[in-house]
């Protein structure tokens, strides 16, 4: 990986069509944004599909400002990007025009810190997010995938297996890697007992990955009507988490639990389900901090951890794994003109299980 040379110097640019929010209470609306002309190490991509992540909703509504991540407007969201390469820089070696390519949550990092050298660019202190992050090339902030095109350094561009449906592949760039990475890090393999808390955008991907890895998969949900879908996605068992009898049958038996719930809930009930040295991993982020009983961790040396997306090499590994096992997200494809309706439905958990925007609709305005 070449070291990034951060620069805010003026360079050639072009105008791209996009949808942006002008403020926290403003609907997303058509606009034009600047994109840099492809440089020596850059790949220009015509965006074909972009998934809608719940973090897009939080960011657009400035709901993370209290956590130190204020939104800069106009905000163009989108970090689940799949498209077709249109131009490449002279030093680009892994892509050519016409290739199908993808971009996830990161578009840059410093390239030489300990985290980058370990392939963990998501933890780089100077990493650049795909949107609402300082743009070291044009100034201002980065703009995401609710747009007709994007220009990204080659290192952060990914190959998409040819057998995957592109609309369904887009959410893999966030929901996919967010759930795949902790399973790989904590060695989810055949024979392990794995719990998935919550069957939403993240949870449904976690079920698919855990099943493909050969684990015995148990889904925890508050909704009995999700049982049939959980089994269809690959779960071996479904537990209604409000049913204390069902929960008590699993005490001390799990190797690994992935908690994908962002709503407030009692995490101690799930900690008790771990065996000795078992791991519960948080990928959901409730607004209020969890109240954790130390004794639940101490007496069986249980571990509570968090996980944030994944590095670039691991994200490519995840996409290749999806190609091998024919794994994609369950999506509802929408035109960009329905994005505000999709946001309202997402806030009411009214989607199975991700929205994917057909960006061809942007051209029909």
Predicted stretch roles:
Residues 203-204:
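N-terminal Rossmann-fold NAD(P) dinucleotide-binding loop
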């Amino acid at each position: 990986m070449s070291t990034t040379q951060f620069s805010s110097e003026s360079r050639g640019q072009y105008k791209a069509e996009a949808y942006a929010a002008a403020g926290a209470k403003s609907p997303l609306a058509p606009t034009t944004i600047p994109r840099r002309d492809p440089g020596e190490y850059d790949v220009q991509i015509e965006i074909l599909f972009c998934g809608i992540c719940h973090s897009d909703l939080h960011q657009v509504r400035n709901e993370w400002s209290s956590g130190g991540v204020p939104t800069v407007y106009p905000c163009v969201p989108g970090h689940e990007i799949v498209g077709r390469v249109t131009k490449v820089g002279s030093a680009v070696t892994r892509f050519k025009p016409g290739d199908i390519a993808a971009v996830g949550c990161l578009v840059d990092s410093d390239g030489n810190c300990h985290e980058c050298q370990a392939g963990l660019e998501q933890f780089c202190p100077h990493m650049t997010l795909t949107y609402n992050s300082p743009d070291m090339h044009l100034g201002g902030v980065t703009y995401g995938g609710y747009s007709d095109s994007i220009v990204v350094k080659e290192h952060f561009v990914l190959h998409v297996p040819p057998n995957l449906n592109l609309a369904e592949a887009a959410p893999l760039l966030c929901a996919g890697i967010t759930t795949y990475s902790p399973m790989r890090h904590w060695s989810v393999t055949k024979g392990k007992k794995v719990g998935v808390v919550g069957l939403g955008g993240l949870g449904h991907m976690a079920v698919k990955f855990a099943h493909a890895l050969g684990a015995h998969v148990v889904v925890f949900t508050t909704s009995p009507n999700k049982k049939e879908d959980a089994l269809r996605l690959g779960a071996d068992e479904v537990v209604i988490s409000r049913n204390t009898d069902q929960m008590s049958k699993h005490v001390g038996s799990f190797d690994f639990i992935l908690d994908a719930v962002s709503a407030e809930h009692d995490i101690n009930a799930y900690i008790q389900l771990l065996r000795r040295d078992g791991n519960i991993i948080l990928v959901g982020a409730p607004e209020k901090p969890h109240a954790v009983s130390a004794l639940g961790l101490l007496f069986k040396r249980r571990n509570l951890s968090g996980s944030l997306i994944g590095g670039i090499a691991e994200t490519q590994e995840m996409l290749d794994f999806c190609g091998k096992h024919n794994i994609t997200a369950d999506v509802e494809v929408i035109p960009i003109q329905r994005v505000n309706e999709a946001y309202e439905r997402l806030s009411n958990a009214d989607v199975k299980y991700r929205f994917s925007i057909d960006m061809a609709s942007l051209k029909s305005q």
